[in-house]
Amino acid sequence: AIFKSYCEIIVTHFPFDEQNCSMKLGTWTYDGSVVAINPESDQPDLSNFMESGEWVIKESRGWKHWVFYACCPTTPYLDITYHF
């Protein structure tokens, strides 16, 4: 799959600005009793990342979350959120 992420850009300190972006991957169709999301590490696989001459990824991390929504307070849903 190919995912595109858009981030809010704040250029107050241009050209020395830093941006923080997040990408959340999960399912609302199947709950945590049916779907297992187990990342191999907290570092995303950037092997297919296309570099840009305009910016660099300085740091990236991922976290697994168990989420309980108001509709179903006893049913866990899983997601992985990556921060760049």
UniProtKB/Swiss-Prot annotation:
Glycosylation site list: 20
Keywords on record: Cell membrane, Disulfide bond, Glycoprotein, Ion channel, Ion transport, Ligand-gated ion channel, Membrane, Postsynaptic cell membrane, Receptor, Synapse, Transmembrane, Transport
Catalytic reactions on record: K(+)(in) = K(+)(out); Na(+)(in) = Na(+)(out)
Positions of disulphide bridges: 7-21, 71-72
Its membrane topology: Multi-pass membrane protein
Cited InterPro entries: Neur_chan_lig-bd, Neur_chan_lig-bd_sf, Neur_channel, Neurotransmitter_ion_chnl_CS
Location in or out of the cell: Postsynaptic cell membrane; Cell membrane
GO molecular function: extracellular ligand-gated monoatomic ion channel activity; transmembrane signaling receptor activity
Family: Belongs to the ligand-gated ion channel (TC 1.A.9) family. Acetylcholine receptor (TC 1.A.9.1) subfamily. Alpha-1/CHRNA1 sub-subfamily.
Function statement: Upon acetylcholine binding, the AChR responds by an extensive change in conformation that affects all subunits and leads to opening of an ion-conducting channel across the plasma membrane.
Name of this protein: Acetylcholine receptor subunit alpha
Origin species: Felis catus
Gene name of this polypeptide: CHRNA1
